[in-house]
Amino acid sequence: MMMMKWIISILTMSIMPVLAYSSSIFRFHSEDVELCYGHLYFDRIYNVVNIKYNPHIPYRYNFINRTLTVDELDDNVFFTHGYFLKHKYGSLNPSLIVSLSGNLKYNDIQCSVNVSCLIKNLATSTSTILTSKHKTYSLHRSTCITIIGYDSIIWYKDINDKYNGIYDFTAICMLIASTLIVTIYVFKKIKMNS
């Protein structure tokens, strides 16, 4: 019975690093997805298209730089809004790149928006893509205010030869170290009891 408890303890300690690794990646996704939400203001006055996007930037990030490109073809407006962020207490290099791109189609009474957002985390080599299709909003005095929401979310790990497998290697090392520590402890306890 005592040996069974020790075996369960060893297995529990062996699985902990792997669970900690996977939960940290999940926390990254759930916290940083909020970077893609905000309000998109579209205004067309005197044949001039103005697009303004106010992103939600959490307190843990510092803003570095921003780009905005707008192209128009007939009643379609294509835009890309990118911004670079760094962790407040991290290095001076950008740690996140967020790119919001979309297609806005308008007529006299409404506008239809297709939006996609890419979050690229340079520290963990992970990317998140959020997409939204055919959201329709009313035009008020040639202004369309859209509240950005998404239909689908895709997470994936980037393939980077320089850092490929570094987090997996760390999790495996923690697994081996914790298994060795628990095994040595069990053998010492068995030796003391006999």
From Swiss-Prot:
Residues 1-22 form the signal peptide. Its main location: host cell. GO terms for cellular component: host cell membrane; host cell surface; membrane. Glycans are attached at residues 65, 114. Keywords: Glycoprotein, Host membrane, Late protein, Membrane, Signal, Transmembrane, Transmembrane helix. Residues 187-194 are cytoplasmic. The chain crosses the membrane at residues 166-186. Induction: Expressed in the late phase of the viral replicative cycle. Residues 23-165 are extracellular. It is a single-pass type I membrane protein. It is found in: Host membrane; Host cell surface. It holds the Pfam family Orthopox_A43R. InterPro entries: Orthopox_A43R. Belongs to the orthopoxvirus OPG172 protein family. This is Protein A43. The gene is OPG172.
